[in-house]
C-alpha cells in the first residue's frame, strides 16, 4: 500500500496513518496531517486509524476510516454503522457517559469562545432516563429501491436512501407502524415519489406516538389528494392492527423543494389530533404542531425552567414562542397570569384549546411576533415578572431582546436547542442589562450531537 508523504499536496484517495485528536460538535473525528485538518466519520479521540482521503479543500478535508490500528475504550463496537452513515445516531459509537461529558464541554467551550468568559456556571448535564427508543415522533422518507417501495433514512448530506428497519432512537411501535405500512404498500404496488422524474405518490411517513397515553397519529405525505387504488384498504388494515391509532391524515406536498410538509391536511380516519400529558396537564397535538420529541426529558427541562424562574403565586409571566402552550399551561397553576404569543395562528388556536381543556382561566394567547406584541402589552400596562423564551435553532432576533428588556422583568428564562446561537444571545442580553446567572444542559437527544439547555438571566 502506497502512502503519499508530500504533506503539502493532499489528493483524493491518499492514505495516511494518524491519531484522532478531537471530536467536532457534529461528532466527526479530527485528524491533522502536518497541521492540516481532516474530518472523519466513525473516529474517536485517541484512536489510531488508516485514513482514506475523500475530499480536500483549501482549509480542511474529509476522510474515512479504512482500518483501526487501535480503538478507544469508549467505543460502542456493536452499533449498526448505518446509524452513523445516516446521522440517525451520529454519537452512537461513543459510550453514553462520554457523550454526556462531550456535550457539557461543548456548551462550556461555545460560551467561552462566543461570549468571551470562562466562568459561566454550566451545571452538570441532566442525563436521559432512556438512551434509546425515546423519540415520540419520526419523519421517514420513502423511495423506490430496486423496484420496491422502501423506508429508511438518507445518507448524510444526500438524498440517497439507506434502508432501515430498526431506527434505534425512536419508540419501537413507531418502527412497527412504518414497516407495516411499507409491507402493505408493497402488496398493492404503490409507487413512492421520485425526485428526478417527479412521479409517484408517497413521499414520507410521519408517525407520532404520545408518551403517556400511547395514542398514535399517522400522516402520509403525498403528492396528490387523490387516493391510489386500495390505499383505503391499507388504512383499514392499519387501524385494525394498531388499535391505539387515533388519527390518519394526508399531507399534500406537490412541491419540488426539500421541505417535508405541505400546508394542506386531509383527515382520513379518526380525529385531527392526539392527546398526551405533560407535567399532569393535557394537550391536544395536531399534525403540524411542535411538541418535544422526548417527553420525560422535556418534563425535566420545563421543571428546571420553572425552578430557575423562581416563580411566585402573584407572578405575571410571558411565554414567548408559545407554540401549543406547553410551557405556559404547565406552570399556569403556579402563577397569577400567563401571556403567550406565537406567529402561527393554528398554534395559537391549539394553545387556547389546550388552556380550556385544562380548565384554566388565567391564560391569554395572541398571534404575532414578540417584537410587536410585547410593546403593545407594555402600553396596556402589562408588566411581566418573568419572560420565558424557547426559540428555534436560529435563536433570537435582536429586536426580541430589546423588546424583552423594555418589559423590565426581574428574570428571563431561555430554553435553547442550539448552544451557538444561545451564546451569541448571551452577549446581546448582557448589553441590554441582563446577566447570565446559570446554565443547565439537559440531554433530550441521546446518541446524537444535539443538546438542549435552560438558562436564567437576572436584571443588573
Swiss-Prot record:
PROSITE patterns: SAM_MT_RNA_M5U, TRAM, TRMA_1, TRMA_2. InterPro entries: MeTrfase_TrmA_AS, MeTrfase_TrmA_CS, NA-bd_OB-fold, SAM-dependent_MTases_sf, TRAM_dom, U5_MeTrfase_fam. Keywords: Methyltransferase, S-adenosyl-L-methionine, Transferase. It is an enzyme of class 2 (transferase). The keyword 4Fe-4S does not apply. GO terms for biological process: rRNA base methylation. It comes from the Bacteria. Residues 9-67 form the TRAM domain. The active site is at 417 (nucleophile). Its EC number is 2.1.1.-. One of its GO terms (molecular function) is rRNA (uridine-C5-)-methyltransferase activity. S-adenosyl-L-methionine binds at residues 292, 321, 342, 390. Belongs to the class I-like SAM-binding methyltransferase superfamily. RNA M5U methyltransferase family. This is Uncharacterized RNA methyltransferase YljE. It comes from Lactococcus lactis subsp. lactis (strain IL1403) (Streptococcus lactis). The gene is yljE.
Amino acid at each position: 500500500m502506497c502512502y503519499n508523504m508530500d504533506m503539502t499536496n493532499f489528493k483524493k484517495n491518499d492514505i495516511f496513518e494518524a491519531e484522532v485528536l478531537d471530536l467536532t460538535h457534529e461528532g466527526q473525528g479530527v485528524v491533522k496531517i502536518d497541521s492540516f485538518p481532516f474530518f472523519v466519520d466513525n473516529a474517536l479521540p485517541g484512536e489510531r486509524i488508516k485514513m482514506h482521503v475523500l475530499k480536500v479543500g483549501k482549509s480542511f478535508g474529509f476522510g474515512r476510516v479504512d482500518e483501526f490500528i487501535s480503538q478507544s475504550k469508549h467505543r460502542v463496537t456493536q452499533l449498526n454503522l448505518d446509524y452513523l452513515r445516516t446521522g440517525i445516531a451520529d454519537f452512537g459509537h461513543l459510550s453514553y457517559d462520554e457523550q454526556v461529558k462531550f456535550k457539557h464541554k461543548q456548551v462550556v467551550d461555545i460560551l467561552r469562545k462566543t461570549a468571551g468568559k470562562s466562568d459561566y456556571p454550566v451545571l452538570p448535564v441532566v442525563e436521559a432516563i432512556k438512551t434509546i427508543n425515546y423519540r415520540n415522533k419520526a419523519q421517514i422518507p420513502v423511495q423506490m429501491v430496486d423496484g420496491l417501495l422502501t423506508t429508511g433514512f438518507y445518507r448524510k448530506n444526500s438524498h440517497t436512501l439507506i434502508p432501515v428497519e430498526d431506527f434505534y432512537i425512536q419508540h419501537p411501535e413507531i418502527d412497527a407502524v412504518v414497516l407495516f405500512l411499507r409491507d402493505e404498500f408493497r402488496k398493492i404496488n404503490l409507487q413512492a415519489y421520485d425526485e428526478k422524474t417527479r412521479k409517484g405518490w408517497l413521499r414520507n411517513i410521519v408517525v407520532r406516538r404520545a408518551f403517556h397515553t400511547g395514542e398514535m397519529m399517522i400522516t402520509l405525505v403525498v403528492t396528490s389528494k387523490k387516493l391510489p387504488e386500495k390505499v383505503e384498504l391499507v388504512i383499514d388494515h392499519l387501524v385494525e392492527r394498531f388499535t391505539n391509532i387515533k388519527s390518519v391524515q394526508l399531507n399534500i406536498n406537490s412541491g419540488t423543494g426539500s421541505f417535508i410538509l405541505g400546508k394542506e391536511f386531509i383527515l382520513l380516519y379518526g380525529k385531527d389530533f392526539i392527546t398526551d400529558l405533560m407535567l399532569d396537564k393535557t394537550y391536544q397535538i395536531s399534525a403540524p404542531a411542535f411538541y418535544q420529541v422526548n417527553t420525560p426529558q422535556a418534563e425535566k427541562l420545563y421543571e428546571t425552567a420553572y425552578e430557575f424562574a423562581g416563580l411566585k403565586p402573584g407572578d405575571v409571566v410571558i411565554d414567548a414562542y408559545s407554540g401549543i402552550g406547553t410551557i405556559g399551561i404547565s406552570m399556569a397553576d403556579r402563577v397569577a397570569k400567563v401571556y403567550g404569543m406565537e406567529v402561527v395562528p393554528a398554534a395559537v388556536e391549539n394553545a387556547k384549546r389546550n388552556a380550556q381543556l385544562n380548565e384554566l382561566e388565567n391564560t391569554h394567547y395572541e398571534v404575532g411576533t414578540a417584537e410587536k406584541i410585547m410593546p403593545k402589552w407594555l402600553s396596556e400596562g402589562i408588566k411581566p415578572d418573568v419572560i420565558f423564551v424557547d426559540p428555534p435553532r436560529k435563536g433570537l432576533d435582536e429586536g426580541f431582546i430589546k423588546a424583552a428588556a423594555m418589559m423590565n422583568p426581574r428574570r428571563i428564562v431561555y430554553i435553547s436547542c442550539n448552544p451557538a446561537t444561545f451564546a451569541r444571545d448571551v452577549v446581546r442580553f448582557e448589553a441590554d442589562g441582563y446577566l447570565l446567572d446559570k446554565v443547565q444542559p439537559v440531554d433530550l437527544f441521546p446518541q446524537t450531537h444535539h443538546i438542549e439547555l435552560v438558562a436564567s438571566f437576572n436584571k443588573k
